Amino acid sequence: RRNYHQGLLGSELSFDEKVKAYKINNIFKGDVWVNPQSPLLRPGLNINIGDYIKKINGNTLTKKYTPGHFLVNQSNDEVGLQVIKKNSKNRRTVTVKTIKDQKSLQYRDWVEYNKSYTHKHSKNKIGYIHIPDMGVHGFAEFHRHFLSEISYDGLIVDVRFNGGGHVSQLLLSKLARKRLGFDLTRWMGVEPYPVESPAGPMIAITNEFAGSDGDIFSHSWK
């Protein structure tokens, strides 16, 4: 059976009845050094949240004929977008290269939002780590945030939607390190003992979608 891969713009859109175009409500940023960004962030396009997309490849968008209609089988292809700037009637056509998958972009934005929310509403007293699975991705994601987030007075470890794997024991062994004191070093200042030990109390967040080794992690935490 033939597959028709959907072209994606790495954004959230909604139809605006007044403008008769699709408003850009959000543009996923993602990671600039590993995964592709949203096509709308391509240098020189000058497309921003609040702008509108009126046409795709010359096809006028309507409430019935959505961007998805005209991006079928257009993944990783260059397409033309007619864009209307926010608070302007001027229209211009730009060329963007669509992407096949935007889950990694959405995930990164979701994690960064959660972390920022936690820091802000705890007045920078609580750290946040999300572990997406107990495999290569989860192991890397854990260590990406671990060293910076354990310096806060408390820590939230989020394993919701964890896809499982086999590294829960390694992560739990690090999180279980009890800070006993500090070393006053000659050159490196004050270092916690043991090193890489959490500074304060921790809680874990889980849900019914944490499976396999993610479920074992949740049970072991209790």
Language-model regions: role of each:
Residues 9-14, 116-120:
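Short, surface-exposed beta-strand/loop micro-motifs that present aromatic residues
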